[in-house]
Amino acid sequence: MDLTQFNTAGIVWPTVAAIAISYILLSSFLSWYRLRHIPGPFLASISSLWNVLNIVTGRTSPVLEKLPGKYGPLVRTGPNYVLTDDAEILRHVNGARSTYPRNGWYEGFKVDEHDHMGSHIDTSVHDAIKSKVIGGYNGKDGIDLEGAIGSQVKTLVSEIRRRHLGQPVDFSRLMRQMALDAITAVAFGEALGFLTAEDGDVFGYVSAVDKMLTYLTLASDLPVVRSVVRSRRMAPAVRCVLAYTGIGRMLNHTRRVVAERYAADDPGKGDMTASFIRKGLTQIECEGESHLQLIAGADTAVTVLRSTLLYIMTTPRVYTRLKAEIKAAVDAGEVVEVITMAQAQRLPYLQAVVLEGFRMRPAVVYGHFKSVPAGGDTLPNGVRLPAGTAIAPNYIALTRRADVYGADVDLFRPERFLDAEPAKRHEMERAMDLNFGLGRWQCAGRNIALMEMNKVFFELLRHFDLQILYPGKAWDEYTGVVYSQHNMWVQITESS
C-alpha cells in the first residue's frame, strides 16, 4: 500500500467536507443577516425548506393565514421572500407610480420556452403586450363575452339534467369543466367540450395538471429549481416531457388553432384570438397568451366557483335568501334565459355573495412577487427593505383581517357588505380589489371571472337545489400557490 496516497486521501476528503460545511454555514448566515430585521419562522430565514414543506404537504393556506397574528404585517417566508397583509404596503408596491419590477418568481409560470404576459419580468415588455390584449379581456373589439360564457352556462344546466340529476356528482370536477369550457369559448370562439365529454377530461389535461401541481408550484417558488427547469439547455427536455402529458396535448391544440388563424386571410371575429391578431401580436406571442388563458383563466376561477358554492350550500340562511332573491327576479321577468352581468349587478344579495366568496377563498393564496428597486426602499410602515428583496401579498391573510372585515372574519356572512356604513363598505371593497392587483399589474381576466361567478351562481340556484353529501368532509383540498379541491360530492335535484 502506498502510504503517501493513503495519507493524502485521508486529508483531502475531510478538507472538502469542511469547505462544503463552511460554505453552507456562511451562505445561511448571509441569507439570514440581510433581512434579519423581518420576523418569521427561523427555518425560512436560512433556507427554502420551510416553504418546500408547506408546498409538499399542501398546507400553504392554513399556515400563511396565521402568520400575521404571530409575526406582524411583514413576514419573512424565505431567504429573500417577504409576505404582507398590509393594504397600504401593497398599494405602495403595486400602485401606478411604483418602480417595483416583477421578481423572477413570475418566470416559473412559463409553460414552454416562450414568455407570455404572466411570465415577462421586463415591465416595458409586459406593458406593451397588455396594451394589445386588454381590449379582448374587457369584451371590446367585437368580443361577445356575455354570449360565450352564457352558452357554456346553458350547457352546464343541460348536462346536469342529462347526466347528473338525482345522483352524486363530483362538483369539484364539474366546476373545473365549466371553467375550462368558458375560457376556451372566450379564447377560441368554441369550447373544447369538457362538459360534454364522457370522461370530462379532453386530452387528459385535467388529470395532468392535478398530477403536476406540486411540481409547478416548486418550479415557481424555488429559484434554484426555476433556473434549472427554465434554462435554455433544459427546454428540449421539458418540451419532451410535456409532449407525453395532457398539458402537452392541450398546448399543441392551442398552437394548431392559432396557426390556422394566422394562415387564414381573415383572423375571424368574436373571440380573443381574433382580437389579439388584429392588435398586432406575433404568432408566438398569441400562442403564449392562449397558454396563459388556460393556466390563469381556469385554475384560479374554479377555486372561487367551488368554494363559494360550498359555503352557500352549508349556510342555510344564505342559501334560502339567495334562492329567494333569484326567484323574485325570475318571477318579475327581470332576467333573460341566462342572466346578463347588468341584470346580476341589480341583485344586491347576489353581489354580496360573490364578494364574500372571493374573500373567504381568494383565487390565489400568495404570490405575485415584486423586487425592491435599486437603492432599497422604505415602506409606508417605516420598515426598510434592501434592493432585490422579493415582496408579495399574503392573500389569504389579507382577506381575513378583522380590522377591515369585522371580528367574524372566519364566518361566511355576505351581509357584512350590505349592513356596513357606506365608508366601511368602501374600505372593504377597496381592500378586496387588492386580490386582483393594482394598476399595470391588475388581473386582466377580472371581468371574465366576475361574469362567470354571477352567471353560474344565479343559473344553478335558479334551476336546481344543491345538497352537499358529506358535510363532515366536504372535499379534499391541497394548497400551494393556488387551491386544488377534489371529491366535492353533491346531490342535485330540480328546484322545488
From Swiss-Prot:
Main location: membrane
Positions bearing carbohydrate: N252
Annotated InterPro entries: Cyt_P450, Cyt_P450_E_grp-I, Cyt_P450_sf, Cytochrome_P450_monoxygenase
Effect of deleting the gene: Leads to elevated levels of N-methylloline (NML) and lacks N-formylloline (NFL).
Top enzyme category: oxidoreductase
Disulfide bonds: none
E.C. code: 1.-.-.-
This protein's GO CC annotations: membrane
UniProt-listed SUPFAM superfamilies: Cytochrome P450
Keywords in alphabetical order: Alkaloid metabolism, Glycoprotein, Heme, Iron, Membrane, Metal-binding, Monooxygenase, Oxidoreductase, Transmembrane, Transmembrane helix
An example molecular function term from Gene Ontology annotations: iron ion binding
Induction record: Expression is induced in loline alkaloid-producing cultures as well as in planta.
Superkingdom of source: Eukaryota
Cofactor dependence: heme
One of the protein's GO biological processes: alkaloid metabolic process
Location relative to the cell: Membrane
Physiological role: Cytochrome P450 monooxygenase; part of the gene cluster that mediates the biosynthesis of loline alkaloids, potent insecticidal agents composed of a pyrrolizidine ring system and an uncommon ether bridge linking carbons 2 and 7. Lolines are structurally differentiated by the various modifications of the L-amino group and include norloline, loline, N-methylloline, N-acetylloline, N-acetylnorloline, and N-formylloline.
Similarity comment: family membership: Belongs to the cytochrome P450 family.
Protein name: Cytochrome P450 monooxygenase lolP1
Organism for this UniProt entry: Epichloe uncinata
